[in-house]
Amino acid sequence: GGHSVPRYVTTKIGSGAGIVSKQLDKCHELGIPIRLRTYVDRIIRTADGVEGVEVFEGYRFPKAGSGRHRSLKANKGVILCYGGFSADVPYRTIQDPKLNATLDTTNQPGATSELWRETSSIGCLQAQNDWIQCGPWGNPHEKGMGIGWQFNQTAAAEYGLWTNSAGNRFVNELANRKVRSDAIMVEQANGRKCFAIADANGVKPFETQRPGMLNKHLERNLIFKYDTLDELAKAQGIDAEQLKQTVEEFNGYVKNKKDPVLGRYINNEQLPVETAPFYVGELQPKVHHTMGGLITDDKCMVLDVKTDKPIKGLYAAGEATGHVHGAVRLGSVAILDCL
């Protein structure tokens, strides 16, 4: 989300698993052991730098202190790739009070703050931990990342439109994630739900990119299909007359290839939203990514909070690091950050 020009490619399966599976294959080929159920309890830092970690092996999430405690000495260094803390409600609420327990997260349950706190305690420089991104395309009728975001973004945001329950567009559907998430939260604060709408033409690219997913959305009641906009509006509690007027105005923008109201980029393949059936899914921002984190030098060495100098033997990459994406990460570009 948020791209103004094409700048990335994706895996055939459309997710990061297509990358991780290849990395695992390479680790097995090189004989690199993968330690599962291993909880890093402490980073061992001395006057000479970082020398290893203390862990609990056989850890049972989320039971703190479970498993067998042992120390692991590093031969050359420790690389921190512990990710973000989007699933840690207390810690993320400290950073940004509005991201409380009422918001779900796209992350797995282990995306917590223990190592964020540990690196802070051993003197690692961190910055902008309150820069936390929500994915605006989430669906409230499923837990976690789910699949509903695929229709909301790939079909409706790119080839349809987003409206509120009053029947009005309220944001540029292709704006960055912060702009869109904030706009949805404002609508919700004023008692209005937000919806992603596409027609028969709008879902065709989605069906091509992700075969079979449209039916899965329908089977799970994440989206609904209607023969007319009137039926859609009545079923979803949207002002029907205003919705039809909004769609008519939007179709004019499509034909003119210009959105003078919200400044949305009109895709050259975009067709007017007028061909039945019409599809709709509800929108709900979910906590997705943390842009702040450890500050590193150009060799990925973590800096000391007192000296701003690299800490010997300590490196970091991925979502654990900061000063990479600014206040709003663009979709997919964290792949290079991790690699």
Q: What are the language-model segments listed below?
A:
Residues 242-324:
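A glycine-rich dinucleotide-binding beta-alpha-beta segment and adjacent secondary-structure elements
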Residues 56, 74-75, 80-82, 165, ...:
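Short, well-ordered coil/turn residues at beta-beta hairpins
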Residues 14, 29, 60-142, 300, ...:
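Glycine-rich loop(s) and the adjacent beta-strand/alpha-helix scaffold that form part
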Residues 9-11, 69, 106, 149-154, ...:
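Short Gly/Pro-enriched turn/cap motifs at secondary-structure boundaries
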Residues 134-139, 178-181, 285-289, 320-335:
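Glycine-rich phosphate/pyrophosphate-binding beta-alpha loops
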Residues 1-69, 89-90, 139-140, 254-275:
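Conserved redox-cofactor binding core of oxidoreductases
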Residues 1, 228-249:
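Rossmann-like flavin
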Residues 116-238:
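An anion/pyrophosphate-binding glycine-rich loop and adjacent beta-alpha core
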